[in-house]
């Protein structure tokens, strides 16, 4: 009998492609702050910390194209390229920095 390991995920053999078919955008982001900023996989990128400098208006309704539950850390003074994908589902955003609090497509 095989024993289960708590939290273990058993997948089929082969590669798993995350977020396939999503229209990804590549964006350059600079941290102009004096502290590291960490952004989680499903955080509405448009509403991230103001010390992150990028073309903010094109990120409305977008999140990082990284596995769920992970994050990217932007160190002070660093410039990083990231990939973003659009939210799916009902496309509503509530919370974060309270800039939207409703539908993303209205």
From Swiss-Prot:
InterPro entries: Urease_beta-like, Urease_betasu_sf, Urease_subunit. Heterotrimer of UreA (gamma), UreB (beta) and UreC (alpha) subunits. Three heterotrimers associate to form the active enzyme. One of its GO terms (cellular component) is urease complex. HAMAP family: Urease_beta. This is Urease subunit beta. It catalyses: urea + 2 H2O + H(+) = hydrogencarbonate + 2 NH4(+). One of its GO terms (molecular function) is urease activity. The keyword Acetylation does not apply. GO terms for biological process: urea catabolic process. Its EC number is 3.5.1.5. It is found in: Cytoplasm. The gene is ureB.
């Amino acid at each position: 009998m095989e024993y289960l390991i708590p939290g273990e995920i058993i997948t089929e053999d082969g590669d798993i492609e995350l977020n396939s078919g999503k229209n990804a955008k590549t964006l350059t982001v600079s941290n102009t702050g004096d502290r590291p900023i960490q952004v989680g996989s499903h955080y509405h990128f448009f509403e991230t910390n103001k010390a992150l400098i990028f073309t903010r208006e094109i990120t409305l309704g977008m999140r990082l194209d990284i596995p769920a539950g992970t994050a990217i850390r932007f160190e002070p003074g660093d410039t990083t390229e990231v990939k973003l994908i659009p939210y799916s589902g009902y496309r509503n955003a509530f919370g974060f920095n309270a800039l939207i609090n409703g539908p993303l497509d209205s």
